[in-house]
């Protein structure tokens, strides 16, 4: 079959184009067995390709000289040297034309090896000039990527860029299974191992242009290779490509390089804009100076000539002068106006921004007065100036921007070349380490072998790999031992935790018991002392009474300090921040300690910095206790001296100020070795001081804890025999006080229920209350208390928390759940010796409104009674209404619409309650339950919780078929309805008119 015809696949093959052979050359050659020895085959041989044609003709066409030089017998078998170099034979004896040049010799053919003739440099140049030989070189990209070509194919004359074979380490390397012989990708083979029909060029075309698609026959790429190297190469080809888990960059570009590029570009843009703006500003100033210079030139050099010409009435000269001015740069219009002439040079109505300058023209003849001749008007075209500035600025901006962008790109490329590609390699290495592969070392592909920071990081990563390997081996060895140690330690910690929890529970029980057992008799001692103060006693008995009261107060102070410090160690309290007056607080503390100071002949002095704001907001309770402790110590250790309290402002910021409060005395002082430990618990100045002055040594420790809880610091300065100065610094928020606190109003007589099981405590509390005019009812336990609450309404209920049979919390809940509701809104105060913070929170959570601690103080009792009068309405409102629900309704519906709905509800109640009472009278419990159910749902949906709860309770009793008292329920529902309407009016949800209408 002729080449170039269908089936050959080589008539228009790229190898023919690259070798310089015409496309129709093979078609023009004669067909037949001996046609391969003609001029066409000679041209093919000159081009460096094996000839094509019949086998016998080709063999006959060989010169006799070459046949004699080979000297090989016609055995029909390939020579040993020929077998070692497959693919370079010229087939002879083929019956068909266009045989494959790259196919193994057929059986019976006599293969003759052919060596490529080496040409001298002169011959190569001569052939290049004639156009018969084109040097074939690998393209630069192939040389750069490291492609190589088989020696056999080069000797066969195939083009290098078509028959190249990539290195196995390249990412486009053909992967094959282990044990499979490597074959050239350009040689396609048939099922029996041979090449497809159509010749070697057709086989190359079938293999694809890039030669990476189809594997060739095994004999085409048979090479000698070391077995170990071959095995390593197979392992590299068969191993899957691993991807690190944490990729530093995507693709071949680095995130850091792109980020650097964008930031440099952004900086370049900002710098370019700024530089352009600065340059534009200076150019603008230069243009304005030039305009001013031209105007000054006109003023100094042209006005005199204009005045002379105008005086001489020389119009021609004036026109010439105007044209001269019009030739100045940026002059849009020049006009001369006078009584004789109106001359104009330039546009009559120029467009754009103009700057108009007018110069008056006057002339003074010799010996005469100066006369006004006219006015010269010059219009300067600022738009032209601005256009020139903009064009120049844009040009410089583009130039600088291009330069800086190029610089940024160069820097980013350099950064990628020097840094990010190595970071990518190190990220892959770190990914392998993260996956647990610690066998592969880290190697960087660096052109510059000089060590730098990247090498330091790589060395650190390699050291980390070695350390991880060592640590893994050591960790595996220590794992079992560590597990056993952890188990033993866990068991020990669990036992210690159980013991600590048991000790903490025992401590809490001990403190609660101690507080209750000591405060209860103290309440009787101090209460009786308070009652006996107004009794008719002699002077000696009064002194004994004062001694008794002083001893009781001292015992109470010690108890309070011990319990307070225990609470602080357990969990420091954070009292509520309130608004207070600092001056009033200091005066109250000084007034409290003034009797003790008078006994020691000690004078108290207060100095308050005028710059200190009076109103503050903060933990007034903590501050009061710290001042009381410090002043109490100063008064106790000072005899016939002076105690000075100073308050100064250290700094002030928006909404707060930092204060320094100091308490100085002239007492005994503190030794130097004790100053560092003076704020520790149970620490005093020494054993002699403890024996002489007494005390627990907890006051300063408590003060330090409280100051630290306030965010401040505390310290002391002292000298033995000269006195001490205790100071602390805190920061307080500023507050505006509404005004002076009004004096406490006299409390009207109240109905008080006192529930106390100890007779002495009942007698003390009753005596103190009755002395102020209050009426007191007594109850020993919960039963009589509940009975009294059902019979009458009280203004205040005092409950002891430790009652026989029923605790005070349960009794409070029972009073709140009483059906008649007489005392459901009555204030209930806890009257107990258990005043720990967690207990106080439980009291308030149970529905109590206050706590009175034992021993009972008269001032605390009066303060609580004073709050009762104002708290009762609020408590009644809170018990009758769900304020949160009503506030939500008012926010969604509006005030007027909510008032209308509440009025309709009250009107519906007025209509339905008589029907409900009638159903109860007629014993129609089903109808009564139905009406109560409807009204209860309406009341609950509108926030009348007390009335809704009463109706719900009535519904349950009616459905239970129990005995229902119609008269009691009628009175109760009427009272609940009136209380609900009054609560709505007091809370502002219902006006007077709406309430009356309801």
Swiss-Prot record:
Per the UniProt entry, the Enzyme Commission number(s) are: 2.7.13.3
Q: Where is the Histidine kinase domain?
A: 513-734
- Record has Phosphoprotein as a keyword: yes
Biased-composition ranges for Low complexity? 40-49
Q: Which GO terms describe its biological process?
A: arginine catabolic process
The places in or outside the cell where this protein is found are: Cell membrane
Q: Name one Pfam family in it.
A: Response_reg
What happens when the protein's gene is inactivated? Disruption in the aruF mutant prevents growth on L-arginine.
Q: Where is the Response regulatory domain positioned along the sequence? A: 751-869
User: What membrane topology does this protein have?
Assistant: Multi-pass membrane protein
| Stored InterPro entries | CheY-like_superfamily, HAMP_dom, HATPase_C_sf, His_kinase_dom, HisK_dim/P_dom, HisK_dim/P_sf, HPT_dom_sf, Sensor_dom
Family matches, as SMART domains: HAMP (SM00304), HATPase_c (SM00387), HisKA (SM00388), REC (SM00448)
The enzyme's main class, written as a single word, is transferase
Q: Which UniProt keywords apply?
A: ATP-binding, Cell membrane, Kinase, Membrane, Nucleotide-binding, Phosphoprotein, Transferase, Transmembrane, Transmembrane helix, Two-component regulatory system
All residue ranges annotated as the HAMP domain in the record: 417-473
Q: What is the recorded name of this protein?
A: Sensor histidine kinase AruS
Please report the organism this UniProt entry assigns to the protein: Pseudomonas aeruginosa (strain ATCC 15692 / DSM 22644 / CIP 104116 / JCM 14847 / LMG 12228 / 1C / PRS 101 / PAO1)
- Gene name tied to this protein: aruS
């Amino acid at each position: 079959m002729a080449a170039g015809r269908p089936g050959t696949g080589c008539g228009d093959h790229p190898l023919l184009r690259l070798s310089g052979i015409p496309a129709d050359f093979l078609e023009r050659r004669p067909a037949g067995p001996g046609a391969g020895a003609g001029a066409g085959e000679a041209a093919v041989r000159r081009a460096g390709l094996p000839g094509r044609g019949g086998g016998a003709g080709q063999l006959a066409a060989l010169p006799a000289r070459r046949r004699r030089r080979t000297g090989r017998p016609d055995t029909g078998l390939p020579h040993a040297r020929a077998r070692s170099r497959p693919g370079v034979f010229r087939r002879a004896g083929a019956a068909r034309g266009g045989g494959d040049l790259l196919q193994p010799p057929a059986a019976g053919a006599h293969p003759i090896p052919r060596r490529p003739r080496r040409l001298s440099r002169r011959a190569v140049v001569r052939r290049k000039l004639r156009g018969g030989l084109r040097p074939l070189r690998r393209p630069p990209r192939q040389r750069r990527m490291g492609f190589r070509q088989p020696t056999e194919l080069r000797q066969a004359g195939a083009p290098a860029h078509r028959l190249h074979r990539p290195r196995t380490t390249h990412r486009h390397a053909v992967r094959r299974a282990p044990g499979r012989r490597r074959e050239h990708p350009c040689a396609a083979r048939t099922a029996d191992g041979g090449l497809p029909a159509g010749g070697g060029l057709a086989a190359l075309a079938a293999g694809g242009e890039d030669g990476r698609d189809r594997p060739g026959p095994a004999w085409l790429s048979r090479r000698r290779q070391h077995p170990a190297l071959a095995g390593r190469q197979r392992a590299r080809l068969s191993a899957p490509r691993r991807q690190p888990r944490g990729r530093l960059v995507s693709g071949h570009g680095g995130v850091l390089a792109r980020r650097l590029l964008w930031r440099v570009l952004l900086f370049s843009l900002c710098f370019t804009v700024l530089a352009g703006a600065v340059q534009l500003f200076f150019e603008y100033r230069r243009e304005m100076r030039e305009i001013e210079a031209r105007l000054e030139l006109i003023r100094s050099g042209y006005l005199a000539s204009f005045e002379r010409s105008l005086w001489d009435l020389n119009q021609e000269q004036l026109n010439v002068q105007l044209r001269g001015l019009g030739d100045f740069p940026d002059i849009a219009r020049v006009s001369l106006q006078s009584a004789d002439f109106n001359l104009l040079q330039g546009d009559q109505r120029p467009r754009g921004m103009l700057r108009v300058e007018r110069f008056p023209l006057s002339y003074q003849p010799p010996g005469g007065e100066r006369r006004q001749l006219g006015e010269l008007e010059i219009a300067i075209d600022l738009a032209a100036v601005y256009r020139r500035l903009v064009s120049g600025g844009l040009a410089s901006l583009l130039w600088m921007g291009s330069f800086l962008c190029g610089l940024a790109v160069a820097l980013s490329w350099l950064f990628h070349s020097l840094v990010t590609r190595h970071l990518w390699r190190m990220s892959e290495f770190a990914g392998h380490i993260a996956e647990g592969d610690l066998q592969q070392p880290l190697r960087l592909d660096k052109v510059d072998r000089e060590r730098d920071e990247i090498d330091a990081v790589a060395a650190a990563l390699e050291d980390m790999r070695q350390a991880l390997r060592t640590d893994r081996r050591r960790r595996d060895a220590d794992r079992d031992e560590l597990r056993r140690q952890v188990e033993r330690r866990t068991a020990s910690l669990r036992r210690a935790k159980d013991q600590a929890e048991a000790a903490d529970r025992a401590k809490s029980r001990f403190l609660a018991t101690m507080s209750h057992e000591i405060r209860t008799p103290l309440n009787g001692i101090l209460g009786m002392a308070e009652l006996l103060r107004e009794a008719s006693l002699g002077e000696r008995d009064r002194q004994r009474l004062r001694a008794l009261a002083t001893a009781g107060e001292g015992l109470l102070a010690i108890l309070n300090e011990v319990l307070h410090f225990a609470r602080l160690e357990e969990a420091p309290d954070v009292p509520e921040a309130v608004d207070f007056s600092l001056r009033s607080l200091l005066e109250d503390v000084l007034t409290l300690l003034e009797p003790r100071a008078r006994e020691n002949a000690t004078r108290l002095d207060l100095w308050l910095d005028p710059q200190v704001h009076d109103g503050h907001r903060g933990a007034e309770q903590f501050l009061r206790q710290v001042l009381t402790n410090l002043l109490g110590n100063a008064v106790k250790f000072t005899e016939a001296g002076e105690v000075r309290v100073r308050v100064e402002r250290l700094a002030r910021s928006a909404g707060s100020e930092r204060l320094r409060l100091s308490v100085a005395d002239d007492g005994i002082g503190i030794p130097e070795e004790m100053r560092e430990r003076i704020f520790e618990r149970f620490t005093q100045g020494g054993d002699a001081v403890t024996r002489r002055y007494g005390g627990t040594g907890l006051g300063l420790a408590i003060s330090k804890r409280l100051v630290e809880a306030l965010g401040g610091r505390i310290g002391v300065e002292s000298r033995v025999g000269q006195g001490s100065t205790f100071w602390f610094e805190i920061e307080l928020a500023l507050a505006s006080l509404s005004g002076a606190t009004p004096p406490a109003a006299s409390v009207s007589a109240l109905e008080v229920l006192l529930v106390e099981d100890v007779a002495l405590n009942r007698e003390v509390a009753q005596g103190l209350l009755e002395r102020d005019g209050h009426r007191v009812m007594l109850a020993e336990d919960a039963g009589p208390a509940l009975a009294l609450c059902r019979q009458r309404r009280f203004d205040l209920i005092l409950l002891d928390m430790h009652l026989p049979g029923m605790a005070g919390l349960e009794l409070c809940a029972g009073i709140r759940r009483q059906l008649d509701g007489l005392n459901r809104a009555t204030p209930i105060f806890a009257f107990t010796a258990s005043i720990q913070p967690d207990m106080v929170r439980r009291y308030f959570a149970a529905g109590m409104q206050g706590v009175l601690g034992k021993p009972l103080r008269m001032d605390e009792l009066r303060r609580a009674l004073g709050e009762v009068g104002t708290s009762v309405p609020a408590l009644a409102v809170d018990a009758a209404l769900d304020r949160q629900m009503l506030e939500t309704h008012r926010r969604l519906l509006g005030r007027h619409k909510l008032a209308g709905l509440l009025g309709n509800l009250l009107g519906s109640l007025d209509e339905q309650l008589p029907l409900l009472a009638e159903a109860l009278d007629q014993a129609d419990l089903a109808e009564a339950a139905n009406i109560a159910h409807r009204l209860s749902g309406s009341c609950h949906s509108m926030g009348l919780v007390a009335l809704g709860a009463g109706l719900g309770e009535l519904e349950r009793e009616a459905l239970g078929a129990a005995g229902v008292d119609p008269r009691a329920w009628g009175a109760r529902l009427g009272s609940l309805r009136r209380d609900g309407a009054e609560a709505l009016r007091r809370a502002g949800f219902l006006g007077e008119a709406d309430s009356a209408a309801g």
